[in-house]
């Protein structure tokens, strides 16, 4: 039987010269056992060859502490899989991104569901469905975790049941949910009433699909649709609720990733992880 444990880390930089090795070293120094990276700048499609990732150095020093399945890769923002005009670019790019992930064994790709422009939300979901099927058909192993969104602009994915319905329609074990605490709060879910929220997740059959958690406080009150992350305990969600999520039995063995703001141009993930763990 799998041991129940807390898996926690943060977004860390994946950059020259050390790439994967450097990201793992930063996470290790933060006392983390998970991490999230972008394989390039979130705003563009430029990627370095996987030969530069320093995979062997990562395996030598950190693989037993930050195991590959707890390395989360976030898809870049430029891939809008719900836009028919960007369909080929988005799907082809993500197929290659998943293949890059396979070189070091990362298990989860977090993906924003997308947004609609000159077309309807219903069409956006239809395009997203086709995109996911294409990507899944041409890749192996990696699980795509659709992120819950705040409702900013014309984003889709703000209603958790809509994402769950899409997953159940496609019927692939390689589809999951990434629950972002700031986003669901900003979208109108009162996660401060945590047990009520968890019961709702169970009622809509969503809880079983949550495989990644983004743990962020929010700069705005509930249902603001703003998507502005705040440091742990400094926002409207509050420390108590966020710590409850970390220790909750329903979320054990799920990688919990912090994406909170830097303070005076310095990341404070080490302090926030320590605070959340009560150390």
From Swiss-Prot:
<feature type="binding site">
    <location>
        <position position="227"/>
    </location>
    <ligand>
        <name>Zn(2+) 3</name>
    </ligand>
</feature>
<dbReference type="InterPro" id="IPR013022">
    <property type="entry name" value="Xyl_isomerase-like_TIM-brl"/>
</dbReference>
<dbReference type="Pfam" id="PF01261">
    <property type="entry name" value="AP_endonuc_2"/>
</dbReference>
<comment type="similarity">
    <text>Belongs to the AP endonuclease 2 family.</text>
</comment>
<dbReference type="InterPro" id="IPR001719">
    <property type="entry name" value="AP_endonuc_2"/>
</dbReference>
<dbReference type="GO" id="GO:0006284">
    <property type="term" value="P:base-excision repair"/>
</dbReference>
<dbReference type="InterPro" id="IPR018246">
    <property type="entry name" value="AP_endonuc_F2_Zn_BS"/>
</dbReference>
<dbReference type="GO" id="GO:0003906">
    <property type="term" value="F:DNA-(apurinic or apyrimidinic site) endonuclease activity"/>
</dbReference>
<dbReference type="GO" id="GO:0008270">
    <property type="term" value="F:zinc ion binding"/>
</dbReference>
<comment type="function">
    <text>Endonuclease IV plays a role in DNA repair. It cleaves phosphodiester bonds at apurinic or apyrimidinic (AP) sites, generating a 3'-hydroxyl group and a 5'-terminal sugar phosphate.</text>
</comment>
<feature type="binding site">
    <location>
        <position position="214"/>
    </location>
    <ligand>
        <name>Zn(2+) 2</name>
    </ligand>
</feature>
<keyword id="KW-0479">Metal-binding</keyword>
<feature type="binding site">
    <location>
        <position position="147"/>
    </location>
    <ligand>
        <name>Zn(2+) 1</name>
    </ligand>
</feature>
<feature type="binding site">
    <location>
        <position position="229"/>
    </location>
    <ligand>
        <name>Zn(2+) 3</name>
    </ligand>
</feature>
<keyword id="KW-0862">Zinc</keyword>
<protein>
    <recommendedName>
        <fullName>Probable endonuclease 4</fullName>
        <ecNumber>3.1.21.2</ecNumber>
    </recommendedName>
</protein>
<keyword id="KW-0227">DNA damage</keyword>
<keyword id="KW-0378">Hydrolase</keyword>
<keyword id="KW-0540">Nuclease</keyword>
<dbReference type="InterPro" id="IPR036237">
    <property type="entry name" value="Xyl_isomerase-like_sf"/>
</dbReference>
<feature type="binding site">
    <location>
        <position position="183"/>
    </location>
    <ligand>
        <name>Zn(2+) 3</name>
    </ligand>
</feature>
<keyword id="KW-0234">DNA repair</keyword>
<feature type="binding site">
    <location>
        <position position="74"/>
    </location>
    <ligand>
        <name>Zn(2+) 1</name>
    </ligand>
</feature>
<dbReference type="GO" id="GO:0008081">
    <property type="term" value="F:phosphoric diester hydrolase activity"/>
</dbReference>
<feature type="binding site">
    <location>
        <position position="259"/>
    </location>
    <ligand>
        <name>Zn(2+) 2</name>
    </ligand>
</feature>
<dbReference type="GO" id="GO:0003677">
    <property type="term" value="F:DNA binding"/>
</dbReference>
<keyword id="KW-0255">Endonuclease</keyword>
<feature type="binding site">
    <location>
        <position position="112"/>
    </location>
    <ligand>
        <name>Zn(2+) 1</name>
    </ligand>
</feature>
<feature type="binding site">
    <location>
        <position position="180"/>
    </location>
    <ligand>
        <name>Zn(2+) 2</name>
    </ligand>
</feature>
<feature type="binding site">
    <location>
        <position position="147"/>
    </location>
    <ligand>
        <name>Zn(2+) 2</name>
    </ligand>
</feature>
<dbReference type="GO" id="GO:0008833">
    <property type="term" value="F:deoxyribonuclease IV (phage-T4-induced) activity"/>
</dbReference>
